[in-house]
């Protein structure tokens, strides 16, 4: 598959990189067939050297004899041969090998042509080659464009699931459902020992260690023990003064990520906590709890 200069300039960097990978993979696949003598095509050399691989005139694979831009030649041990178009060779898409039922159209002989395909022992393909899901090489351009489009969408990391309360978007619906607990104050995970409830199962598991009394993580500064290693690291910042979390809006630093998240709401105006009675919104949970006492 080849691009003219105009076509090449329309591709973005991601598409060009993908084209590079696909073309070199296809070249290596053909080599692995051991059916061709392969002088390296100019387009592959350009890709390896980091040069732009566009051509002056975008060639198309033909069903008739003539020049082929790939420069591939079938292995040949006879002088009497006929040129064969690469587009007529059917290659199995999934396994990357030529099918035992590959159809080869042999056009009228045209002598003296360079960079064409010489047919050798037509039809004597290995009988053990699989036959399923064959695709012609002439469809590579369409397949590549489809692959580029799919890859571009994946890179964009589309997030179709949107929270109606704060506008935050998510890639999967399950993440949206979990996020919405922030607004609804839903806490589906309950401790069977003290009836305390939690929004996340991970928080419940951490809480259960407080009942077990196991605190294997000890601060070397003050001797205080913790049930979770993360809690120990957070605590140690009170001794070291470390503040690794930085607000990119104002440059203010924080020792805990949760403190940074709360601070960011002063810039974004986000108010994720909603009163279930009057629907008023708050940026901090503590503010919501104080407000709810007014309804009692």
From Swiss-Prot:
SUPFAM superfamilies: beta-beta-alpha zinc fingers, KRAB domain (Kruppel-associated box). A zinc finger (C2H2-type) spans 161-183, 189-211, 217-239, 245-267, 273-295. It holds the Pfam family zf-C2H2. GO terms for molecular function: DNA-binding transcription factor activity, RNA polymerase II-specific; RNA polymerase II transcription regulatory region sequence-specific DNA binding; sequence-specific double-stranded DNA binding; zinc ion binding. Disulfide bonds: none annotated. Keywords: DNA-binding, Metal-binding, Nucleus, Repeat, Transcription, Transcription regulation, Zinc, Zinc-finger. One of its GO terms (biological process) is regulation of transcription by RNA polymerase II. The keyword Isomerase does not apply. InterPro entries: C2H2-ZF_domain, KRAB, KRAB_dom_sf, Znf_C2H2_sf, Znf_C2H2_type. Residues 1-66 form the KRAB domain. It is found in: Nucleus. One of its GO terms (cellular component) is nucleus. May be involved in transcriptional regulation. Belongs to the krueppel C2H2-type zinc-finger protein family. PANTHER family: FINGER PUTATIVE TRANSCRIPTION FACTOR FAMILY-RELATED, ZINC FINGER PROTEIN 502. This is Zinc finger protein 75A. It comes from Homo sapiens.
């Amino acid at each position: 598959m080849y691009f003219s200069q105009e076509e090449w300039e329309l591709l973005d960097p991601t598409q060009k990189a993908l084209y590079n990978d696909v073309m070199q993979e296809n070249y290596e696949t053909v080599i692995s067939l051991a059916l061709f003598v392969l002088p390296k095509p100019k387009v592959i050399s350009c890709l390896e050297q980091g040069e732009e691989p566009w051509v002056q005139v975008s060639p198309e694979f033909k069903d008739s004899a003539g020049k082929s831009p790939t420069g591939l030649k079938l292995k040949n041990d006879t002088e009497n041969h006929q040129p064969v178009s690469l587009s007529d060779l059917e290659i199995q898409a999934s396994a990357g090998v030529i099918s035992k039922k590959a159809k080869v159209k042999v056009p009228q002989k045209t002598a003296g042509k360079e960079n064409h395909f010489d047919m050798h022992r037509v039809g004597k393909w290995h009988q053990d080659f699989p036959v399923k899901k064959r695709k012609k090489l002439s469809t590579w351009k369409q397949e590549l464009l489809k692959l580029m489009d799919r890859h571009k969408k994946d890179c964009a990391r589309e997030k179709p699931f949107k929270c109606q309360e704060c506008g935050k978007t998510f890639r999967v619906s399950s993440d949206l459902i979990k996020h919405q607990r922030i607004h609804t104050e839903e806490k589906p995970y309950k401790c069977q020992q003290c009836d305390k409830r939690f929004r996340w199962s991970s928080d419940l598991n951490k809480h259960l260690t407080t009942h077990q009394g196991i605190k294997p993580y000890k601060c070397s500064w003050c001797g205080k023990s913790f049930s979770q290693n993360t809690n120990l690291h957070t605590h140690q910042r009170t001794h070291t003064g470390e503040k690794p979390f930085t607000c990119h809006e104002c440059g203010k630093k924080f020792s805990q990520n949760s403190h940074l998240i709360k601070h960011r709401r002063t810039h974004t105006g986000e108010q994720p906590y909603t009163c279930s009675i009057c629907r008023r919104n708050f940026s901090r949970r503590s503010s919501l709890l104080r407000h709810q006492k007014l309804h009692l």
